[in-house]
Regions:
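Membrane-proximal helix-turn-helix segments that form the acceptor-binding/catalytic region
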Residues: 104, 130-147
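Carbohydrate-associated surface elements
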Residues: 153, 173
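Aromatic "clamp/platform" in nucleotide-sugar-dependent glycosyltransferases that forms part
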Residues: 281
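Glycosyltransferase donor-sugar binding loop
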Residues: 39-44, 174, 205, 230-244
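Nucleotide-activated donor-binding/catalytic signature segment of Leloir-type glycosyltransferases, i.e.
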Residues: 243-263
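Conserved donor-binding/catalytic core segment of Leloir-type glycosyltransferases
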Residues: 148, 174, 185, 190-212, ...
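Short hydrophobic beta-strand element within catalytic cores of glycosyltransferases
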Residues: 298-301
Length: 375
C-alpha cells in the first residue's frame, strides 16, 4: 500500500509523537509498504529524503503556527494519491488537508488522537477545541474511516465521545538505545550537573504542562526529606518555562533537592536515573514510560496511564494520584540492587511486547480491512 503518515511536527519539543510517528513510519516501510512521512516546520523545503520505501518530506509551516497551516503540504497530499491517509493529532489544519486528500483519492482516513480525546484533555481549553473542530478541520472526526489508538483506555475515550467507527489498538514500539548513546547521555548530564554522579536520581522527563502534574510533583517531593535522592525535572517547556519552574522550586525551598533543565536538545537522561516518575492526569500511551523501562529504569506512574501491568510485572507501580505519596516513599527506600532488579524485569517485558514491527503488522491489517469495506 501507498500510505501517508502525517504529523504536524517532528520537532523534539512536541514530545512523544515526534518520535513515535517516525518509528511507525519506519516499521510500515520495513514490512514492504511505500510510506510518506509528512510533516511541517518553519522554513521547510518539502525535499524528499528517501530511505528504502520511506519517503520523508518536511514542508513549510505558515502562520498562525499554532494551527500548522501549510499550502505545500496540502498540495502534495492532493496530488500524490495515497491509498491510506493516516493523520496523528487533532485541532490542526493538517488534519483538514488529510481529510480532503482522502476524499479526493477515495482512500480511508485514519486518525490517531494521540491522547487528545481523554476526558481531561478533551475538556482542557474546551472553547479552543470546539473552534478547531468546527473551523480548522470541519467534519474530519465524523467522517474518518477508522481510528488508531495506543491503548484500550484510549479506545474507550473515543466510544465515550460517541464515535462509532472501527478502532485499532496498536501500542507504540520502543527501540533500545546503543551503548554509545547511553554513554554520551551520562557524560552530558553529569557534565551539566556533577551532583548527579554522587546522588541517586528520580527523573521526570516529559513536557512541562499541567497535564503532567509537574507542579504537584514538586510539592510532593518537597513535602518530606528524600535522603540522598535528587529530583531531575528535564522537560520540554510548554505551559511552564524553565525559569517559572525554577522560581517555583525556589519559593518552595527546594534548591539543592530539585534540578530543572530544558531537555529539548539534550540526550534523553534515563541513563543517570534510578527511578522514573510520571504523575500525569492522562496519557494515551506514555512513550517515556516505555523508553525508561527498555533502559532498565523502573517507573512510578498514575492509573490514568495505560501502564497497569507495571504492578504484575514488578517493574514499578501504577496507582491513583491521591495514593502516589506512599509508593513513592517506598520505592525511594529500596536499595539500588532492588530497583535495578525491577528495571531488568521492565526491560525484558517491553522488549518482548512493544516492537514497531508488531505494531506495523497490526495496523497494516487494519488498513486493509478499511480498504475492503470501502470497495
Amino acid at each position: 500500500m501507498k500510505i501517508a503518515q502525517i504529523v504536524a511536527s517532528l520537532e523534539s519539543r512536541h514530545g512523544g509523537p515526534s518520535r513515535s510517528v517516525r518509528g511507525l513510519a519506519c516499521g510500515l516501510a520495513g514490512i514492504g509498504h511505500t510510506v510518506g512521512l509528512l510533516s511541517t516546520v518553519p522554513g521547510g523545503d518539502g525535499v524528499s529524503k528517501i530511505d528504502g520505501t520511506l519517503d520523508t518530506r518536511i514542508f513549510a509551516r505558515e502562520r498562525p503556527q499554532a494551527f500548522c497551516p501549510s499550502k505545500p503540504l496540502r498540495h502534495h497530499l492532493l496530488t500524490t494519491g495515497y491509498e491510506i491517509v493516516h493523520h496523528h493529532g487533532l485541532w490542526l489544519r493538517t488534519l483538514h488537508y488529510a481529510r480532503r486528500a482522502a476524499v479526493k483519492a477515495s482512500a480511508p482516513l485514519v486518525i490517531s488522537p494521540r491522547g487528545m480525546m481523554s476526558e481531561w484533555a478533551w475538556n482542557h481549553h474546551r472553547f479552543k477545541k470546539s473552534f478547531a473542530a468546527r473551523w480548522i478541520h470541519p467534519k474530519a472526526l465524523a467522517t474518518a474511516a477508522g481510528w488508531h489508538v495506543t491503548s484500550d483506555g484510549e479506545a474507550e475515550d473515543i466510544r465515550r465521545l460517541g464515535f462509532t467507527q472501527p478502532v485499532c489498538v496498536a501500542p507504540n514500539g520502543v527501540l533500545p538505545p546503543s551503548v554509545d548513546e547511553e554513554t554520551a547521555a551520562i557524560i552530558h548530564w553529569r557534565n551539566a550537573y556533577p551532583v548527579l554522579a554522587a546522588r541517586r536520581v528520580a527523573l521526570f522527563y516529559s513536557r512541562f504542562h499541567a497535564k503532567k502534574r509537574v507542579l504537584e510533583l514538586i510539592d510532593l517531593w518537597l513535602s518530606v526529606p528524600r535522603g540522598d535522592w535528587v529530583l531531575l525535572l528535564a522537560g520540554i517547556p510548554e505551559e511552564y518555562t524553565v525559569a517559572q519552574l525554577e522560581g517555583y522550586v525556589l519559593r518552595q525551598g527546594g534548591i539543592g533537592r530539585i534540578l530543572v533543565h530544558d531537555g529539548t536538545d539534550a540526550p534523553p537522561p534515563y541513563a543517570v536515573a534510578s527511578l522514573f516518575l510520571l504523575p500525569s492526569h492522562s496519557e494515551n500511551f506514555g512513550l517515556v514510560v516505555a523508553e525508561s523501562l527498555v533502559r532498565g529504569v523502573p517507573v512510578l506512574t498514575t492509573d490514568a496511564t495505560p501502564w497497569h501491568k507495571l504492578e504484575t510485572v514488578g517493574a514499578g507501580r501504577c496507582v491513583p494520584w491521591n495514593l502516589y505519596a506512599k509508593p513513592l516513599a517506598s520505592l525511594l527506600a529500596e536499595t539500588p540492587e532492588t530497583l535495578a532488579a525491577r528495571g531488568r524485569l521492565g526491560s525484558a517485558w517491553v522488549r518482548d511486547d512493544f516492537s514497531w514491527g508488531k505494531t506495523a503488522r497490526t495496523l497494516s491489517a487494519f488498513y486493509e480491512k478499511l480498504r475492503e469495506a470501502a470497495r
